[in-house]
């Protein structure tokens, strides 16, 4: 028998989440963001469930090629563009749309020998200060690209740094408008947060990521609780040991939890080597036999401890939901001082994954 931990992926939830994105951005087309191996869910496992998308957006050539080999014939957007000039041969072969954000990429495109022009997403730095041209350079760069035989359709893109806030995109939108002055261009601006909360930024293409997988771009589940979005991933395990503590006894490495009274705890087959956050403190929510309770003590490599006071019926073999439909990944992440994105992406290879 295998160790009882597993991650299950609800593909119907994934389909529903894409449908909700379309309802939120009715006039825009959708790039479904599947970077980081579909946020830890596995591109090969999930892509066909959202095959009704208009396009896929990601980073790695290997993942783009996987989509082509699995039969996806629609658009693929490479969000960070090509990393080396020689990559353009592969972009040409697989008909990939590339982001352009740096001067050297302009030169590489100019000098490349392509069989057909590539579609381009010109990135403007609207305040995130990661990638992209400054707004006052965009018109010049646009004209340079437009004059190249290797360039096909062009779209202006940017990425919001604070779209989870009600007034969080106003400054960025002003910079984008400055960049787009004098251009008649398609635009792709909205990440997950802007897709949900800033319809004025939808334009031609939205780029939802985390919301497709049923977690909140703000890191707070309550912000999306009424949207109909559903968690796709459930991480579950079982109790493999039970201890009855006396008052004053401590639990785990460093003895960071001390029982105030006699207390039963369950030892769960899950730890930080599985992707559960090591920094999750005592009190992190967990579901035992359908009853909400909490972790106690320090998370170990392969195990963690939970309070069985609310569920005295629990024992060896009792099911445990670490995150999923009832215990939201955002809540676990918040307790651990991180975000749901990180927990999804950190799911360890040793954890078996099933689709339902």
From Swiss-Prot:
Binding site residues for substrate: 130, 301
Record-annotated active site: 35 (proton acceptor), 253 (proton acceptor)
Induction data: By alanine.
Gene Ontology BP, a term: D-alanine biosynthetic process
Gene Ontology CC: one annotated term: cytosol
Keyword annotations of the record: Isomerase, Pyridoxal phosphate
UniProt key word Ribosomal protein: no
Keyword ATP-binding: no
Record-linked SUPFAM superfamilies: Alanine racemase C-terminal domain-like, PLP-binding barrel
Any Pfam family hit: Ala_racemase_N
GO terms assigned for molecular function: alanine racemase activity; protein homodimerization activity; pyridoxal phosphate binding
Catalysed reactions, as listed in the record: L-alanine = D-alanine
Listed cofactors: pyridoxal 5'-phosphate
EC number: 5.1.1.1
Modified residues (N6-(pyridoxal phosphate)lysine): 35
Alphabetical list of InterPro entries matching this protein: Ala_racemase, Ala_racemase/Decarboxylase_C, Ala_racemase_C, Ala_racemase_N, Ala_racemase_pyridoxalP-BS, PLP-binding_barrel
Protein family according to the UniProt entry: Belongs to the alanine racemase family.
Record function comment: Isomerizes L-alanine to D-alanine which is then oxidized to pyruvate by DadA.
Descriptive protein name: Alanine racemase, catabolic
Organism: Escherichia coli (strain K12)
């Amino acid at each position: 028998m295998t160790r009882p931990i597993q991650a299950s992926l609800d593909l119907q939830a994934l389909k529903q989440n894409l449908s909700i994105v379309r309802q939120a951005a009715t006039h825009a087309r959708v790039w479904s963001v599947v970077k980081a191996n579909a946020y830890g869910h596995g591109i090969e496992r999930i892509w066909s469930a959202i095959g009704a998308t208009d396009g896929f957006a990601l980073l790695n050539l290997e993942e783009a090629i996987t989509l082509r080999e699995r039969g996806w014939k629609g658009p693929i957007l490479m969000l960070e563009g090509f990393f080396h000039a020689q990559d353009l041969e592969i972009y040409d072969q697989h008909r990939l749309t590339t982001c352009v954000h740096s001067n050297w990429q302009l030169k590489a495109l100019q000098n490349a020998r392509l069989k057909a022009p590539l579609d381009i997403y010109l990135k403007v730095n609207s305040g995130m200060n990661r990638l992209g041209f400054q707004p006052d350079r965009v018109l010049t760069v646009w004209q340079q690209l437009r004059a190249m035989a290797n360039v096909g359709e062009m779209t202006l893109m940017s990425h919001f740094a604070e779209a989870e806030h009600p007034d969080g995109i106003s400054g960025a939108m002003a910079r984008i408008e400055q960049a787009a002055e004098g251009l008649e261009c398609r635009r792709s601006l909205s990440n997950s947060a802007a897709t949900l909360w800033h319809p004025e930024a939808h334009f031609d293409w939205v780029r939802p990521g985390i919301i497709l997988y049923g977690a909140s771009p703000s890191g707070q589940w309550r912000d999306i609780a009424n949207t109909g979005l559903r968690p796709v991933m459930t991480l579950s395990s079982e109790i493999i040991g039970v201890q009855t503590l006396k008052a004053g006894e401590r639990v785990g490495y460093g003895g960071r939890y001390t029982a105030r009274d006699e207390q039963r705890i369950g030892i769960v087959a899950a730890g930080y080597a599985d992707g559960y956050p090591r920094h999750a403190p005592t009190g992190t929510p967990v579901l035992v036999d359908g009853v909400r309770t909490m972790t106690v003590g320090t998370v170990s490599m392969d195990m963690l401890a939970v309070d069985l006071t609310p569920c005295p019926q629990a024992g060896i073999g009792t099911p445990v939901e670490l995150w999923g439909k009832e215990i939201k990944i955002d809540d676990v992440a918040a307790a651990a001082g991180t975000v749901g994105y990180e927990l999804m992406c950190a799911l360890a290879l040793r954890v078996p994954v099933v689709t339902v």
